[in-house]
Regions:
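Generic beta-strand/beta-sheet core signal
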Residues: 95, 109-110, 146, 202-212, ...
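Cap/lid segment of the alpha/beta-hydrolase catalytic domain
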Residues: 101-193, 198, 204, 229-243, ...
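Conserved beta-strand edge residues that scaffold enzyme active sites
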Residues: 150-151, 275, 516-517, 565, ...
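Primarily recognizes the serine-hydrolase "nucleophile elbow" in alpha/beta-hydrolase
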Residues: 186-260, 549-622
Length: 706
């Protein structure tokens, strides 16, 4: 499986041209021709919130402190903030030249491990030659330096960036998208106030990431310079998870982003970048490394090949030969791309004195952190209304409902789960007997699915199965870190051998092995899949389709009576596989059904995943599309059941009831299906109860009780 995804990642580069239709007849035609790709990039970056229009930056001072935090005979530096979107602001510094005209307007973005004061010369950490915001201001530029959220750990062993990324991702937003919006809000102000003045964006490390994306999505930016970041993105799954962009590599690597910036000047400073190792804990293990020079050159050469037909040629520049980021050569080229007649001034010798003697950056960072969290939580509260506008099947009749539901099924598979565009392999079934009991016989089964991908499970056949008899099948699914064997023997506290007990009742059962096993090993699969616009279920669904197709070839299986029953992560499977594998005639979700979007995005809900170690669990933009009620809608009109223990820590009873009420209303209120949707509440924990669900199976699979 790992090799399959690595192969898909490698193949993604060659598949990208299919998404582009570049017109090289003129610069204007070219820019217009790549606009659909630009819009797609903005969408996957989560740039959906309307930015606030404003007339000027706010000078951040009080009766006790001035907004003026530093000045020399060449520049002034003010603490500033500005509206970005809704109630979210940007904050940082404004540097302006003294005694001369402004030649260009610039946004200079530090790495997330830096504070604005460092690149402005107000704080320790950088020598004057590396204080690129200061040097640009001293050379005649007006410069705004925004603050980024840092990557320090919270007390929960989770970085601040990952914490904010998690809930935003579930709601179709990105932390990097929020920071791009803050940058573009400054660009809005620049263009509104000085429409004829050139605008440039420059950044190092994480600031380079924001620079590159901002320049790619906004053509008003006249030039961009990226230092310590530009590289092949094929190993993005090893980078911090807050850089994870769902579907990025489907259309975009860094070379393709450059092709969106073209024909505008783009400078790559192949200098040392930030370096860090994030061990994980509750968060995703990752690393930040300096891009290798060879890789940088190769990716830039690929960009040049993508736009080689563009005339006049795009102005791409590579600066190499130095480890120090954004020093003379790179900074000089960036300045000349904005103001050709302006030379970069010499670096000063000393830092600038900070006029706030007891300056502490921590309160500013905390305020920005909580603003972003509050905005995302507001999106969460609004999301039920967004989904209600999104999911509108025709419920005037069951037939019309089924027909109108197909477009949502397609969207769910293509845009939420992610569909691999490849044919499944022939079944090539292999089996061996591994159980021989008084009431049933068990066989291990292996099926081919894709290259380097198999489906594996255990088939249990009741001993009283007669020749020429066709019986119903229940596909029984284990949970997180589980095995098929766990639901067959040894009376596991959660499973209680439910696959074996159903076989004792006369059902044929099949217990597949799903991918969610071996902790970071399977979570890394999700990380490799996401940039391809795929998920773990992009593989699990074809595996289940192959299983169902194989079951249908067995002479003793009734093709119309194949049911699904899963617990915990298997219940998560019950909500995602039957909507797509419609061969399943019913679905039972045990110990998982809840208000899933809230569980993934809430920073208040005590049951939330936001502070958990399950960093793979978050799914792109479910908040705007499919919560569990909508997923159940894709199962309808087939029978659907929830098994819920009062003391199951997955969620509270009231949360489960809230979401289930929507499903019940669809089945019984709108579609008038009185007997196909139910929930069993029982006095117990996270476990198979095996009472109401067994009755449900007997009734809907038309199999007598024993």
């Amino acid at each position: 499986m790992d090799q399959f995804l690595l192969d898909e990642l490698a193949a993604s580069v060659a598949k990208r041209p299919a998404y582009w239709d570049r017109d090289f007849s003129s610069h204007e035609a070219y820019v217009k021709s790549v606009e659909p790709n630009r819009k797609r990039l903005a969408h996957i970056l989560g740039l959906r919130d309307a930015r606030t229009v404003f007339d000027g930056l706010q000078l951040d001072g009080t009766t006790a402190t001035s907004s003026l935090v530093g000045q020399t005979d060449r520049i002034t530096i003010h603490a500033v903030s500005w509206p970005a979107f809704r109630d979210v602001t940007g904050t940082g510094l404004l540097l302006e030249p003294r005694g001369r005209d402004v030649v260009a307007n610039v946004v200079a973005i530090p790495d997330s491990g830096q504070i604005p004061e460092q690149i402005a010369g107000l704080s320790l950490g950088l020598t004057p030659e590396l204080q690129y915001a200061r040097r640009l201001a001293e050379s005649g530029c007006r410069v705004v330096v925004p603050m980024l959220i840092d990557r320090q750990e919270k007390i929960t062993r989770l970085t601040r960036r990952e914490f904010l990324y998690r809930s935003a991702f579930e709601l179709g937003r990105q932390l990097v998208g929020y920071e791009i919006q803050k940058t573009l809000a400054v660009v809005d102000w620049y263009k509104k106030s000085w429409p004829a003045k050139p605008v440039g964006v420059i950044g190092w490390g994480e600031g380079g990431l924001i620079t590159q994306y901002a320049a790619a999505v906004d053509t008003r930016i006249d030039a961009a310079c990226v230092s310590g970041y530009f590289d092949s993105r094929q190993n993005i799954w090893q980078e911090p998870i807050d850089r994870n962009v769902f579907g990025l590599l489907e259309q975009f690597g860094d070379a393709e982003l450059v092709s969106l910036i073209a024909p505008r000047p783009f400078i790559v400073d192949a200098a040392r970048g930030p370096e860090a190792t994030i061990p994980g804990g509750r968060g995703a293990p990752s690393r930040v490394v300096t891009p290798a020079l060879g890789s940088v050159k190769e990716e830039l050469a690929r960009a040049e090949r993508l736009i080689e037909k563009l005339e006049p040629r795009a102005k791409l520049r590579l600066v190499e030969g130095g480890q120090k980021p954004l020093t003379g050569q790179a900074l000089g080229q960036f300045l000349k791309s904005l103001a050709a007649d302006t030379a970069l001034g010499q670096a000063g010798e000393n830092n600038i004195t900070h006029l706030r003697k007891k300056f502490d950056a921590a309160p500013r960072h905390a305020a920005q952190f909580h603003e972003i969290d509050r905005h995302t939580q507001w999106l969460l509260r609004e999301s039920p209304f967004v989904r209600k506008q999104f999911y509108k099947p025709d419920t005037s009749s069951v037939a019309k409902f089924e027909a109108s539901n197909e477009k949502y099924r397609t969207q769910f598979y293509d845009d939420v789960i992610g569909r691999f565009d490849r044919k499944r392999l022939p079944l090539n079934a292999r089996s061996r007997k591994i159980y021989d009991t008084e009431k049933w016989v068990g066989h291990e089964v292996v099926l081919d699915v894709f290259p380097n991908v198999i489906a594996y499970g255990i088939l249990l056949l009741p001993r009283d199965l007669k020749a020429d008899e066709k019986r119903p099948v229940v596909v029984c699914q284990h949970g997180l870190e589980g095995r098929p064997q766990d639901i067959i023997q040894d009376d596991h506290r959660a499973y209680h051998d439910f696959a074996a007990k159903l076989a004792e009742r006369g059902f044929i059962t099949f217990s597949p092995q799903n991918l969610y096993i071996f902790t970071d090993r399977f979570r890394t699969l999700q990380r490799k899949a996401n940039p391809l616009k795929k998920t773990l279920f992009s593989v699990i669904i074809p595996q289940h389709q192959q299983i169902v197709d194989w079951l249908k070839t067995l002479s003793y299986v009734d093709k119309e009576r194949i049911a699904f029953y899963g617990l915990s992560y298997g219940g998560k499977t019950a909500m995602r596989v039957p909507p797509v594998v419609t061969d399943y005639c019913l679905s039972i979700c045990s110990a998982d059904f809840n208000e899933w979007v809230d569980k993934n995005a809430s920073t208040r809900n005590p049951h939330s995943y936001v502070n958990s170690g399950e960093y793979e669990i978050f799914e792109w933009d479910l908040g705007s599309t499919f919560n569990y009620a909508e997923m159940a809608g894709l199962i309808a009109p087939r029978p659907f059941m929830v098994e819920r223990g009062h003391y199951d820590g997955v969620a509270s009873d009231e949360t489960v009831g809230w979401e289930f009420a929507k499903v019940r209303f669809l089945y019984q209120g709108k579609l008038k299906l009185k007997d196909r949707c139910e929930i069993e509440w029982f006095d117990g924990p996270h476990t198979i109860n095996g009472k109401g669900t067994y009755d449900f199976l007997h009734r809907h699979l038309n199999w007598p009780k024993r």
